[in-house]
Amino acid sequence: MSNNGSSPLVLWYNQLGMNDVDRVGGKNASLGEMITNLSGMGVSVPNGFATTADAFNQFLDQSGVNQRIYELLDKTDIDDVSQLAKAGAQIRQWIIDTPFQPELENAIRDAYAQLSSDDENASFAVRSSATAEDMPDASFAGQQETFLNVQGFDAVLVAVKHVFASLFNDRAISYRVHQGYDHRGVALSAGVQRMVRSDLASSGVMFSIDTESGFDQVVFITSAWGLGEMVVQGAVNPDEFYVHKPTLAAGRPAIVRRTMGSKKIRMVYAATQEHGKQVKIEDVPQEQRDIFSLTNEEVQELAKQAVQIEQHYGRPMDIEWAKDGHTGKLFIVQARPETVRSRGQVMERYTLHAQGKIIAEGRAIGHRIGAGTVKVIHDIGEMNRIEPGDVLVTDMTDPDWEPIMKKAAAIVTNRGGRTCHAAIIARELGIPAVVGCGDATERMKDGEKVTVSCAEGDTGYVYADMLDFSVKSSSVDTMPELPLKVMMNVGNPDRAFDFACLPNEGVGLARLEFIINRMIGVHPRALLEFDDQDAALQNDIREMMKGFDSPREFYVGRLTEGIATLGAAFYPKRVIVRLSDFKSNEYANLVGGERYEPHEENPMLGFRGAGRYVAESFRDCFALECEAVKRVRNDMGLTNVEIMIPFVRTVDQAKAVIEELACQGLKRGENGLKIIMMCEIPSNALLAEQFLEYFDGFSIGSNDMTQLALGLDRDSGVVSELFDERNDAVKALLSMAIRAAKKQGKYVGICGQGPSDHEDFAAWLMEEGLDSLSLNPDTVVQTWLSLAELKK
């Protein structure tokens, strides 16, 4: 395989490691590194070989084609899209027309014969690996070609030639210029690998870090049916999974969140073999769309491999994987440094200050907001229509589009998931993108003004009109010490990993209502009595509960995922989860809810909180919440999760709810379980010592306490100006509660809106000796720093 005793033209993966990047590029060096070092640790990589940078440079040198290439590039205006396209096409044709040197062709022939082992049906993947590719500060995502299901030596040779030419794709030329790479300093290596038969199973991409927030305690996995190109290109909306690393390391169930993608199409082997037609795209049968493309066990196994790879490289990694449909075995087919989050950024908080009509929604990429004029682009020929500040709307972006993507204020696509090329490039460029909207190109019209928001969690929204938004930047490394803990109020698990990156000392209020409303959306009684519902409602519920075995499991499973996400995001800090505090009108708004809820004149003071939990009409619904908490604490081991009981009206009710929790397997003190009570009714403060006999502490709910102390309806605009937590009567009640808790040596914090809105109120609470303030995430840093100033 050597060239007359000089440097080799072809090397096997098991001869390679990361010190060979300059010889075979980042992608091939990484595959060799894993085969050499991680095979014995459960990481499986298909065998293969790589042509070297020397082979590529000799190929260009032999005919003088390199001189023509660099002369043409030097006089091409890269920012002129048509000039770039013309030059790129000319260079690629020159390369394809240039024959391989005989030494290289013979070296590839020898390696191919050994790799195929005379198997006539063997199929191969031929991939590019650039010598500057996958450096931690430059994502060359998808800038060179990949050929799949290549069969026969002649076809492999043609594919290698096309891979060589792909170093001069328009997008690769543009990218090198903008990243400051010299064309002359970059060479290309072709990797030839045995194919994993994922056309008969599933494949996808995973990151050893959360791609949106940079939170590093989870593995993020995407998966769809068939060959992985559909996920990488963004042609499908894949399934998504988050796996918590510490829970995985403890040998416990560690999947904290699952989202089912539509997975409408897949790439499979084509029956007839022609160059460029080795694969075809087909529709996925409905029954396969409606199930997850990986089992929970496979998700955990992939996550273990991701952790092994990350630990070996000592940095966050971006990994492509494939499942073999014949054997069921999981393989790693690529691994490279994760490039966006590993750069480190100043913390930015985008906040939308208005709500408009929602035109489209999909998966949010990043956390930014952009606004501009819609340009619907149907194909690459329309690229020159994009002006700086436009919102690019298209079916799916190809990596060829990178030169125009950087002009856009935002990007919106019909197809794609959070690990596709469009997502990776959008993150790198710092442009908000909403992918996988389904029909954005039909719903959004050329010339209309829109706002694209990725600042509201996993779901990204496109709103009509240019809405007002702001951005705050902060780069606080260490926070000053305070005599109390600054915690956070969090309702949306989608934002948990993002919020966990803020300075914090845990979660003082995690609300279940958001999970029930957004992740479930069905009344628990309608699920427990599913067989009694009419056919239309049953069909609606079946559509909502795809991926779950039963209506009951849907409710418990989704609650478990939501609570586990919150617990994992802040682990090992305490996360106080308040059990459901919907009022009857809010429960009635859930699917199937009207049938089961009373009509109350004032639901705020009606059937809610602890009284609901112990009522015969709701006990078995409450049991579903308890089951979810038990799974999170006992099965997953997230014992940092504590529970909080809202709206406990009487001491007898306190006793009854503690007994009910024990009956449901949540016994105070068992497995370290702490049960906190919301102190939000004047009776709670007046009889604080008696209530505290049944609980491990208080969390003050200043919203309800204020309205009940002052006799106000906080939802009424007529009396809203009188609502003030700083009123002396309210403060007197809070002082009573704080003193009682201190006297018994029990926890007392606050999770109401007051300290987030009024820094003077927060300062008063600190002087009163409160153990913790739980604030809205957007006020944490400012309030923390302000209180520290007061203590100086």
Task: Give, region by region, the residue ranges found by the protein language model.
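Acidic, glycine-rich flexible loop/linker segments
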Residues: 66, 338-343, 347, 360-364, ...
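Conserved catalytic alpha/beta cores of large enzymes that bind or transform nucleotide phosphates
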Residues: 218-318, 323-324, 363-370, 388, ...
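Conserved metal-phosphate-binding beta-hairpin within the catalytic cores
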Residues: 142, 314-339
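Small/polar (Gly/Ser/Thr/Ala-rich) solvent-exposed segments
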Residues: 214, 450, 704
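N-terminal beta-alpha lobe that positions the nucleotide/phosphoryl donor
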Residues: 1-191, 200, 286-297, 302-305, ...
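Conserved alpha/beta-domain cores
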Residues: 112, 120-125, 130-140, 144-148, ...
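Beta-strand scaffold of nucleotide-dependent catalytic cores
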Residues: 138, 148-149, 159-160, 202-211, ...
